[in-house]
Amino acid sequence: MPIAFTRCGSALHRVVARSAYSPCAARSYSSYVFQENDIVLVQKKTDSSAKQILSKPLRPGKRVNTSSGHIDHESIIGLSPRAIVSTATGKGEYRIYRPTLGEYANLTARIVTPVYPADANLIVSLLDLNPTVPDPSSSLPSPPLEIFEAGTGHGALTLHLARAIHAANPAPPPIPSRARPALAPDSEEGTSDAVEAEYQAAVDKWEAYKPTRRAVVTTLDISARHSAHAKTVIAGWRRGMYAHSVDFHVGSIPEYIASRLATSPEPFLDHTILDLPDCHLYLETISQAMKEDGTMLVFCPSITQVIACLKQARKEGLPLVLESTLEIGQAAGVGGKLWDVRAVRARSFVRAEAAEAEKAEGGEEGVESGTEGSEADVVAETTPKEAEPLKPESDGWNMVCRPKVGDRVVGGGFVGVFRRVVK
């Protein structure tokens, strides 16, 4: 580092001239460089509003296709985020980024519509997840925090859930790949045995690791194709950063819950998210597997489906209470639009029912005074949390369904927040 001395009067001062190319001056914001198997975001250097391109995992010999020509993966590997790279033809310059989780979820190839980042973040926040870090000094194993997602779909919501809990788990071993390395035709049998032994050792390590997890997302889909696609989406994010916190299953909800309860009759689910048609048909099955005070979210495209869940829960006398209903989507705001969904009975019906009860007991006096006052008000103003179990609809129950404030706006769907309570 160059050092110069200047004299001011009788004092000699040392002046340090830092070179523009010294390590400290040239230090970038991040020392990270892109490596093989990373996924990058590519965008035109001169147009921040241009379409973003999500690359495939970086590998030698592969390329990113753009409107100005292709970019070889080799020219990206070794560069830092926000670096500029030219196309092979030299006709265009592009800036490369590390994609955010939301950008990755939006831009990955899809076979079903994903849950968009704003909605996924809101849904995760409604669960109020607070997983604890592993305690190496504890010798007593505790049951893990388990979130059940019915309807894996694209895997975007699964990815957001896994991000919220993955820090509670110890560092995982490499997840064994189902695709075993292909052997050359002239390979020896001993080589094949070695590959098989290595693969089996990786499987054994992974199976030994799974019981040590303190938080897990169990995701189920009826379609094997959707589940397999979601698995690749999870594995592609930062080289499978959250893959160890997710268990994928294919099948129906009744079959899966029944198989789990057959091995252990105790409730095992802390929270549940239902993102599938006819959610109300599965409430009874899932409530048997949910722990007390757990949260069940039903994510539906229409408000009538949330109403169907509320009616089903009360009709069957299930230990589920509807705490709130939110409309989500870009038009509803970041925090969701609150809806008032509850079951009520008209005061006139309550008075008539009370009169019938008095007649059955042989007296009719005091009916009006007994029902006109506080009792009728309490019934009419009952909140979802305080409501008694709903009797059949012939008993006079009706649904209140309206936005809490203002008029209804078109949104991306509705979330009903149910709480598992003591029966």
Language model features with spans:
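Intrinsically disordered, low-complexity glycine/charged-rich regulatory or linker segments
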Residues: M1-V115, L129-N130, G363, E375-K423
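C-terminal substrate-binding/active-site "lid" region of AdoMet-derived donor-dependent transferases
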Residues: P2, L283-F414
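Conserved class I S-adenosyl-L-methionine
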Residues: D128-G155
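Glycine-rich SAM-binding Motif I of class I
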Residues: G155-L159, H280
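Helix-to-beta-strand junctions that scaffold the AdoMet/dcAdoMet cofactor pocket
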Residues: I165, N169, M290-E292
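Helix N-cap at the beta1-alpha1 junction of Rossmann-like dinucleotide-binding domains, i.e.
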Residues: S177-A179, A224-S227, I303
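S-adenosyl-L-methionine
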Residues: L183-L274, G335-K337
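A short SAM/SAH-binding and catalytic strip from SAM-dependent methyltransferases
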Residues: E266-L281, F299-I303
